[in-house]
């Protein structure tokens, strides 16, 4: 009984040991062990000529490109460029690197890439680029059994982006990344987007502080140079600028400063210190805003949209200051002098009228006329020449330049009566004509100038804003 139980327990314990021995024997014969892989890599690199492309003398090598965009770090209007960090992958087939016996892909150390042929790819519009090197150089080389090579890099590049800033900051920009072969022509190498529309990834995850990526487009083409035709791939980003920052930093302050300059129209015109200080402060503030904006933009020859708005605000602020200069000139300057002179002329005329109303009579009862009265009477007699009698002469000459008025005849009385009846008719016509005239503000009245400015400036500025935003906002 004991013997049978010992045999059964011994059989149960020996079964796992036998399975382990079989597995060890199988693993010792596995061709993917370290020694076999080492021999395979040594065999692939032995006699490999890095100077010759795959299928040298045969058809061109097809190189597929894939880009995973990690971030767009900066878009600079001053330097006309943008900075892009990406995972850049290239794949091609090299029959010299095909192997068998190992059903696995071989991911090798990045230093092996220096011993293999790789495409001479470069970025056409590159200004400054580098491959990240922390903690080691960020390169990947992976071999497939059929000889396909996958070569990956983590690159940060600063690429040129020519911008049209005529509609800045209500603009859209198109920034591209141009990928091209430097030395190999289309007879030796061809580029294509590996994966079609899915060759570029990560764009939808990018968030920029001043831009929104509206769309991106991939293009494959050939370019002709004197040395031949070269393959080129283009990745273009359509960037739309976010207006929120500029509304808060530029448009709203400029608008409020312009409105603030109109406060002077409600300040009394004799408060020179207050109105001048307010006008100069608003002008200097607008100048500061414009100067700060120009420092953040390149020196370009054309006018930008924001320049037009700031210039319009500056003109309104400056005109508000000039309006007080005009009011001050009317109130304290030449205007009062003209008013004083007109008052003196009016008093002189009234004095002359009083003197003319004084009647002088000689000893014979004749009325004495002065030289001014003679002229007035003469002009009146010329008008009534047609109805007067040549025999009824109203004046007689005296060497003392004093004239004697004789009694009027019936015809003279008729003429004077006609003249008296004609004057009221002319007065009625003049009154009716004055009623038809449009009321025009008196520019010599300082209160009227300020009153009209309170309406003119806001209405004109509102029309300016309506035209501006309708034109520049799509």
Swiss-Prot record:
Signal sequence region: 1-25
Topological category with respect to the lipid bilayer: Multi-pass membrane protein
Family: Belongs to the ligand-gated ion channel (TC 1.A.9) family. Gamma-aminobutyric acid receptor (TC 1.A.9.5) subfamily. GABRB1 sub-subfamily.
Subunit structure: Heteropentamer, formed by a combination of alpha (GABRA1-6), beta (GABRB1-3), gamma (GABRG1-3), delta (GABRD), epsilon (GABRE), rho (GABRR1-3), pi (GABRP) and theta (GABRQ) chains, each subunit exhibiting distinct physiological and pharmacological properties. Binds UBQLN1.
Cited Pfam families: Neur_chan_LBD, Neur_chan_memb
Extracellular side: 26-245
Function of the molecule: Beta subunit of the heteropentameric ligand-gated chloride channel gated by gamma-aminobutyric acid (GABA), a major inhibitory neurotransmitter in the brain. GABA-gated chloride channels, also named GABA(A) receptors (GABAAR), consist of five subunits arranged around a central pore and contain GABA active binding site(s) located at the alpha and beta subunit interface(s). When activated by GABA, GABAARs selectively allow the flow of chloride anions across the cell membrane down their electrochemical gradient.
Residues in the Cytoplasmic compartment per record: 328-451
Top-level division of the source organism's lineage: Eukaryota
Paired cysteines (S-S): 161-175
Localization per Swiss-Prot or TrEMBL: Postsynaptic cell membrane; Cell membrane
BP terms from Gene Ontology: cellular response to histamine; central nervous system neuron development; chloride transmembrane transport; chloride transport; gamma-aminobutyric acid signaling pathway; monoatomic ion transport; ovulation cycle; response to progesterone
The protein's name: Gamma-aminobutyric acid receptor subunit beta-1
Molecular function terms from GO: G protein-coupled neurotransmitter receptor activity involved in regulation of presynaptic membrane potential; GABA receptor binding; GABA-A receptor activity; GABA-gated chloride ion channel activity; ligand-gated monoatomic ion channel activity; ligand-gated monoatomic ion channel activity involved in regulation of presynaptic membrane potential; monoatomic anion channel activity; transmitter-gated monoatomic ion channel activity involved in regulation of postsynaptic membrane potential
Catalyzed reaction equations: chloride(in) = chloride(out)
Residues with glycosylation annotation: 33, 105, 174
Alphabetical keyword list: Cell membrane, Chloride, Chloride channel, Disulfide bond, Glycoprotein, Ion channel, Ion transport, Ligand-gated ion channel, Membrane, Postsynaptic cell membrane, Receptor, Signal, Synapse, Transmembrane, Transmembrane helix, Transport
Residues annotated to bind histamine: 122, 181-182, 227
Comment, domains: GABAARs subunits share a common topological structure: a peptide sequence made up of a long extracellular N-terminal, four transmembrane domains, intracellular or cytoplasmic domain located between the third and the fourth transmembrane domains.
Source species of the chain: Rattus norvegicus
Sites where the protein binds 4-aminobutanoate: 182, 227
Main localization of the protein described in the UniProt heading: membrane
């Amino acid at each position: 009984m004991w013997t049978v139980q010992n045999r059964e327990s011994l059989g149960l314990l020996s079964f796992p040991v036998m399975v382990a021995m079989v597995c060890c024997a199988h693993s010792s014969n596995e061709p993917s062990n370290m020694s076999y892989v080492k021999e395979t890599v040594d065999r692939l690199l032995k006699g490999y000529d890095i100077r010759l492309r795959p299928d040298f003398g045969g058809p061109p090598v097809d190189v597929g490109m894939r880009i995973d965009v990690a971030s767009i770090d900066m878009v600079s209007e001053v330097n006309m460029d943008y900075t892009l960090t990406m995972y850049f992958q290239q794949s091609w087939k090299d029959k010299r690197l095909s192997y068998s016996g190992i059903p696995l892909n071989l991911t090798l150390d990045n230093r092996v890439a220096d011993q293999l042929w790789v495409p001479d790819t470069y970025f056409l519009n590159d200004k400054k680029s580098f491959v990240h090197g922390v903690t080691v150089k960020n390169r990947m080389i992976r071999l497939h059994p059929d000889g396909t090579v996958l070569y990956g890099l983590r690159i940060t590049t600063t690429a040129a982006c020519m911008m049209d800033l005529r509609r800045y900051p209500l603009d859209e920009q198109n920034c591209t990344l141009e990928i091209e072969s430097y030395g190999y022509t289309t007879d030796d190498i061809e580029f294509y987007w590996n994966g079609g529309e899915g060759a570029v990834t990560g764009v939808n995850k990018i968030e920029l502080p001043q831009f929104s990526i509206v769309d991106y487009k991939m293009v494959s083409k050939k370019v002709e140079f004197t040395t031949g035709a070269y393959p080129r791939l283009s990745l273009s980003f359509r960037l739309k600028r976010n207006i929120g920052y500029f509304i808060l930093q530029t448009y709203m302050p400029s608008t409020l400063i312009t409105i603030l300059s109109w406060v002077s129209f409600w300040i009394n015109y004799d408060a020179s210190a207050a109105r001048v200080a307010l006008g100069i402060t608003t002008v200097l503030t607008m100048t500061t805003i414009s100067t700060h904006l120009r420092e953040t933009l390149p020196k370009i020859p054309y006018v930008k949209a924001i320049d037009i708005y700031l210039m319009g605000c500056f003109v309104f602020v400056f005109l508000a200051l000039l309006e007080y200069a005009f009011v001050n000139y009317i109130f304290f300057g030449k205007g009062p002098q003209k008013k004083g002179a007109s008052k003196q002329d009016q008093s002189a005329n009234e004095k002359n009228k009083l003197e003319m109303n004084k009647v002088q009579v000689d000893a014979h009862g004749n009325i004495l006329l002065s030289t001014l009265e003679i002229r007035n009477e003469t002009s009146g007699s010329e008008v009534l020449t047609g109805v007067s009698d040549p025999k009824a002469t109203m004046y007689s000459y005296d060497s003392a330049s004093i004239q004697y008025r004789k009694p009027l005849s019936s015809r003279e009385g008729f003429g004077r009566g006609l003249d008296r009846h004609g004057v009221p008719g002319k007065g009625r016509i003049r009154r009716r004509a004055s009623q038809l005239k449009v009321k025009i503000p008196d520019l010599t009245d300082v209160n009227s100038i300020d009153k009209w400015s309170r309406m003119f400036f806001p209405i004109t500025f509102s029309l300016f804003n309506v035209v501006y935003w309708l034109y520049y906002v799509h």
